[in-house]
Amino acid sequence: MTIKTPGTPVSKMDRTPAVTPGGSSRSREEKIVVTVRLRPMNKRELLAKDQVAWECVNDHTIVSKPQVQERLHHQSSFTFDKVFGPESLTENVYEDGVKNVALSALMGINATIFAYGQTSSGKTYTMRGVTEKAVNDIYNHIIKTPERDFTIKISGLEIYNENVRDLLNSDSGRALKLLDDPEKGTVVEKLVEETANNDNHLRHLISICEAQRQVGETALNDTSSRSHQIIRLTIQSTHRENSDCVRSYMASLNFVDLAGSERASQSQADGTRLREGCHINLSLMTLTTVIRKLSVGKRSGHIPYRDSKLTRILQHSLGGNARTAIICTLSPALAHVEQSRNTLYFANRAKEVTNNAHVNMVVSDKQLVKHLQKEVARLEAERRTPGPSTEKDFKIQQMEMEIGELRRQRDDAQIQLEELRQKLQGDQQQNKGLNPFESPDPPVRKCLSYSVAVTPSSENKTLNRNERARKTTMRQSMIRQSSTAPFTLMHEIRKLEHLQEQLGEEATKALEVLQKEVACHRLGNQDAAQTIAKLQAEIREMRTVKPSAMLKEVGDVIAPNKSVSANLKEEITRLHSQGSTIANLEEQLESVQKSIDKLVMSLPSNISAGDETPKTKNHHHQSKKKKLLPLTPSSASNRQNFLKSPCSPLSASRQVLDCDAENKAPQENNSSAARGATTPQGSEKETPQKGEESGDVSSREGTPGYRRSSSVNMKKMQQMFQNAAEENVRSIRAYVTELKERVAKLQYQKQLLVCQVLELEANDGAGYSVENEENTIMEDEEQNQVAWHITFIEERQQIIELWHVCHVSIIHRTQFYLLFKGDQADQIYMEVELRRLTWLEQHLAEVGNATPARNCDESVVSLSSSIKALRREREFLAKRVNSRLTPEEREELYMKWDVPLEGKQRKLQFVNKLWTDPYDSRHVQESAEIVAKLVGFCESGNISKEMFELNFAVPSDKRQWNIGWDNISNLLHL
């Protein structure tokens, strides 16, 4: 289980508590570190005298030179985290650019280092140096940190044509699937992960991954990377001391060497290289789209991570939980200024992308259980005993005191109000029987003392001043007070009532606040109880769950010779004279093809089931004959026919599997056609005989029975004509196909000889002659032999690889491999075979696995038919193991070729291992020797290279498709 927590220094690791499940973890936002490296001019650019288009003005800025600013709206200056010029070393790029990102994996933070740029800009060169420096620093850190145990695991993969391949297990040869894991994200199924024992072992594993990567040659780079390579180091560190704290870090460090973007017009790629470039550009376009959308900051919009397997695997490194550094490599040449500017635009976008990296800590199950138990105990203790008063408690106490004071003031006010009411009632009762002018002094004095209208001291002063006016004054004051006393009392009562209402409202508010606080305390206790219950349930689950375990340049050197030149000129003259013949033959073939199409369209389409049965049986009988094997131990004549050169792709395997197809097929076709033609002719002859034997024919011509029998005879004749016509159409179509093939080969031979004659004439016109070269002919021959030997080895290796790709007959491979050893006379055979295989590879790529329709064009070759023919050929060779090899030889070969001694179908297993590795010359040699022994090439002494004469001449045993139907032959004009 992985828990995400903030980064913690190693020195404080033991004091860092683990993060509780479900708790939030802080993450550190950080932008992608972008550096740019400008490489020096290479040899191609120096030879082409290209100009320098970019220069580094300082450590952070790169600018384009003024002469290359074609348009004003182009940005000419770019600023990045670090810029390295042509003189900088890879060590400087690592130290100042990506070292901090790489070493963060030792602290539990995921890290990724990209190398991005166009083809031949120096990405692979830079990544190799960066990887080497990172490995050194990782193991130096391990040595300096003895208090922790480190485990380093490595895995490698490449994305080739959108297929994921394991670089550490290249023997599997199959594409790996991508799976979605809820915790880990996108993972690669069945990806091999090796544990590195030390730094040398880790370097050895990295070198294996680099050696297994797909590399090809283009016009811009001799060793161009044709796939994206990802090398991942998984680093886990654990504290040696036993501690209850979280003490295990786990992080991954990715070294991503991207394939370079390229333009087909500059790389001159075609075929396989063109397809590879298309896949590379598509994945890089998806990466650019992801970077562009992340740089805008609109995380709510859709980001197409799943449009490419590259972005899907590296999703966490692009805006996720990782620190990322991108090294953009540039070519300074003016010829690549547009691609370099696009790379800088990409880097400008990438530096705006923000990642959220955090430390990844791992906790074992036992430690997690202990931690959860402590949390439960702590929460229960807090529930039982309240903690110290907090700020809320202090506020509650203040509010309670205010409420008590307000209640006391309210009670005092109520008491005073009651006293006033009682006194007022008493005064009213006394004043009912008395004159208000003679009322006594004390009540008035008491009311005056409360109302604070007249004080006793003022009365005494008044009496002392004028004792004589005492009665008058007292009377006036009595009258004044008696009239104002009720109004004053009512005003005071209203004031007290208003004060009482205010006090009541304040007390009610205080009570409501107190009730809310009490309710919050109750809810807090309920939440704590629920949390404790959840934690206890998790502990019970953790206790029950147990812990779970994870093309070379080829030089054709033809020595000028008068006799050779004369022979070639005669041959080319003959071929020019045959040009009209070939053209006439092609026109004739076109007319035949049109006639066949017309004939097929004129045939009736509705055939009854009873009429189809004989044709089906006949076809089934012929297909059974075709499946017979041609070689038997006692057949010597068949063996020579069997060794005949193929005239079309994969015809060697057809010769092995078709029963004497080239020698006996015409007789079989004639016999089967004769049977198909005899039936209608015989029936035409038998019909009048039956009519003569039956008696009066002329007397019955007008009867209904005679009309019915004649209609039946006409139907039979039509059906028989249809069957024979269909047989002729099939035979004609096969013959026309053979003629087209031979015409194409004649044209090829003509072009080849024309090229040779033109080359000789050019040499003669330049002043070369046999007499002038007699002095240096020995030296030229030696040089030619050495050059031809090198060319022969390279061409033979290409032929062997194309044999493997096109699933060519292994008997044909053995014949060709054993006959041609590198003589000068072998040159034309090697060139023709190489061109034939190149055409076959393109043809198979266009056709694919499509299976040709029966009885239409059996010469069409598809990939599935080639594999099927090769499998039948291996089964045939497996049957000859017992008859051609002694028991001792068989056992020795079984042990040598790793065939289990007690397994089933050991002969077939042994044969299936032959001709399977085109890159191992020893394997190819031994396979050819074994196949030759099984077939019997070694026993026949008349095998020569003329058997591979490419069948330029029309064979004498062509099929006799004309089986006697004059009307059809006249129709086709043949």
From Swiss-Prot:
Chain spans, region Disordered: 1-29, 605-649, 663-713
Keywords in alphabetical order: ATP-binding, Cell cycle, Cell division, Coiled coil, Cytoplasm, Cytoskeleton, Microtubule, Motor protein, Nucleotide-binding, Phosphoprotein
Region forming the signal peptide: none
Coiled coil (UniProt feature): 362-435, 565-603
Effect in UniProt of substituting T703D: Inhibition of the function in cytokinesis
Keyword Electron transport: no
UniProt effect for mutating T687A: Inhibition of the function in cytokinesis
Residue numbers binding ATP: G117, Q118, T119, S120, S121, G122, K123, T124
GO CC entries: microtubule; phragmoplast
Record CDD domains: KISc_CENP_E
Composition bias, Polar residues: 638-649, 666-682
Chain ranges of the Kinesin motor domain: 31-353
Alphabetical GO biological process terms: cytokinesis by cell plate formation; embryo sac cellularization; gametophyte development; microtubule-based movement; pollen development
Post-translational modification: Phosphorylated at Thr-145, Thr-687 and Thr-703 by CDKAs and CDKBs. Phosphorylated NACK1 fails to mediate cytokinesis.
Location(s) in or outside the cell: Cytoplasm, Cytoskeleton, Phragmoplast
Disruption phenotype: Growth defects, dwarf plants with small, humped cotyledons and leaves. Development arrested at the vegetative stage without production of reproductive organs.
Function of the protein: Probable plus end-directed motor protein that functions in the NACK-PQR (ANP1-MKK6-MPK4) MAP kinase signaling pathway, which is essential for somatic cell cytokinesis, especially for the cell-plate formation and its expansion. Regulates the activity and the localization of ANP1, probably by association through the non-catalytic region of the kinase. Functionally redundant with NACK2 and essential to promote the progression of cytokinesis and for cellularization (formation of the cell plate) during microgametogenesis and megagametogenesis.
The protein, known as: Kinesin-like protein KIN-7A
